[in-house]
Amino acid sequence: MTTTAIDTPTGTAAAQRAQKPLTEGQQSKGTLIGLWAFVTLPFLALFAVIPVAWGGWLSGTDVAIFAVMYVVTGLGITVGYHRYLTHSSFKATRWLRVTLAVAGAMAVQGSPTQWVADHRRHHQYSDLEDDPHSPWRFGNSLKGLTKGMFHAHVGWLFARELSNRARFAPDLLADKDIQKVDKLFGLLSLTTAFAPAVVGGLVTWSWQGALTAFFWAGLIRIGLLHHVTWAINSVCHVYGERPFEMREGDKASNFWPLAILSFGESWHNLHHSDPTCARHGVLRGQIDISARVIWLFEKFGWATNVKWPKVERVKAKMIDRDAQPKLAR
């Protein structure tokens, strides 16, 4: 069975890429309008959660469709876009690579190539001037940090200039499968928003079932996953613990309350200390659902060369040199 790695070349190739501009082109007005719609409408829907549920417009069918869509698209981001496409934490079979890219696109957080370019840029300049979404961008005063938190959480999405894909994601630009998913991003965004309504309507054979499924598994699911993902950029660079060493200036932290909803992404301090590690919650007791999914992929033979944490490497990265870390199983 053929597996594929997403390579991030080093040496001469990396030096040549570093000479390319930081950004390329601008988002079109049409793109910005679509962005406003997919950011604003799910967010506004979140305010209607209690009255809609209280009014009896929530069924077991809605919950089931919501759960399936949240897990599939959430793992598309955490396992697919992030740990695989961005950081090459494992190699994947071709069908798994494409499936993960499609699932990530259906989270409506950007096309695979642009998402990866933004994130690799973030790691290269984490919490420095060229970081696309640092909460410390406007200083550490109350006013500056408040403005920075909004910028890191959602404001940066509306920046006109785009991270240069040729500089930060040349491997994906050369990947024909990923480029096909890029081109289908708009269609996949509409599909993920309205497919729940179709399923809900067919299961209940009613317009009400279609409407409530659209609300819960479409709007609410997209909105919740958006803000959980964005909280990694904002909250997890301000609040939480930092037991692992990072590059000077980097403020990535572990924020346990988001561990389950983010599928393990909120163990952000270790991730910035060791970006290619397939498990972010490396210590015992740290829930990392994404890592468990990768483990399952490995058991089925769909993922190989998984970069699992090792005690010696984890210990070497800990600030407390006397610590004796017990790794998660």
Language model features: what each stretch is:
Residues 169-177, 241-267, 273:
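Active-site-proximal inter-transmembrane loops
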Residues 1-230, 235, 277-329:
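Non-catalytic, topology-defining segments of multipass membrane proteins
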Residues 239, 264-265, 271-272, 278, ...:
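Short leucine-rich amphipathic alpha-helical surface patches
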Residues 89, 238-243:
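Helix-loop boundary elements of multi-pass alpha-helical membrane proteins
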